[in-house]
Amino acid sequence: GLAEVTIENGRLLLNGAYVKMRGVNRHDHDDHRGRAVDMERVRRDLELMKLHNINAVRTSHYPNDPRFYEMCDEIGLMVLAETDLETHGFENVGDIARITDDPAWEPAYIDRIERLVLQERNHACVVLWSLGNESGFGRNIRAMYGRCKELDPRPVHYEEDRDAECVDVISTMYSRVSQMNDFGEHPHAKPRILCEYGHAMGNGPGGLAEYQRVIDRWDSIQGQFVWEWCDHGLAATAEDGREYHTYGGDHGDYPNSSSFCIDGLVLPWQEPSPGLAEYKQVLCPVAVFWMDGLLHVRNGRFFTDTSDVVLDLERVVDGVTDSVRLLAPGTLVPGQQTVLPCPVEAAAGALTHLTVHVRSTTATAWAPQGHELGVYQFVVADESGPDA
């Protein structure tokens, strides 16, 4: 395909249309082979993203195999294409920008961005270039930006250009919900993204719905990327033959980061976690609200209508589904809303819910016909009594 990425009046446009990136940060990882990742596994990663309403991926923090970008072109994932630059370790001596602001290192910095752009600039999936990650700011970042723009006109991102001196898209990581709302209330002249947030460690990412409400509220905030896609556990075999997964320190390695890399939306063997299920629901592209016998439906997509969408309605009485019907929302263009009659009779002496499954009626390269985009549930009436 062909893509044109522009910025007009502080808004990022893809082929002339406003868009928000609903993304994740992805590292190459295989629980049996480490960084040696075959393309079948890469394909599975990307299909899982699409199945969970994710439309963008950041190649944190290095270029990927060229076939990765071909797959993103094919299945429709936007890419924040990042070069392999990080000087995070210099924080240990109090100067993260030590070589970033050293002219002796300029050729090496330029070489990094040249290799990325020259290799991937013919891919329509690339929406933003990224100059690297956590390397401070200085003269070599300015030089990288200039060379990047010479090679390709697409917008450039770099989170540690905090004042957006040269980058085209301003970015932060791990900003609080209240900070994001402040950013929206007082927008920068350039579009804004949240390149890392929702650190998916332990019990999972927190506050995703709260973040999404703020991100959806403000047009100047045009994307977010959860940290991160996959747990970096490595498979091992116990004495009894069972497989288990290890992390830092389990192999006698020292120093190590302990479990700090067990922070993904999918488990090491590519099984979705509950956190990914939550993110999918938060990103559901067709929003549904029910009140007083009416379904309010909004098309939150950016490019396609809802002619392929059906609502699968269930009345649930005391936890048991007792009736099912289908309802088509009609052809809503992006951003359009409608109200549909949906009377639901409350069951006497029981707790009655309305469950709405949002499904696609068409098969795609990554999903079968009938794929569920999201599910909503509403309390119709609670007549179960105080002892229920």
What do these predicted regions represent?
Residues 1, 6, 296, 328-331, ...:
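Generic structural detector for well-ordered beta-strands
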Residues 1-296, 300-307, 312-320:
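Extended substrate-binding grooves/exosites of carbohydrate-active enzymes
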Residues 1-2, 16, 363-387:
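Short beta-strand elements
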Residues 278, 282, 312, 348, ...:
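Extended interaction regions within the primary functional domain
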Residues 292, 322, 384-387:
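Flexible inter-domain linker/hinge segments
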Residues 301, 355, 360, 383-388:
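Beta-strand-rich N-terminal accessory domains
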Residues 309-311, 316-351, 355-368:
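Intrinsically disordered, low-complexity Pro/Gly/Ser/Thr-rich segments with frequent PxxP/GP/PP motifs
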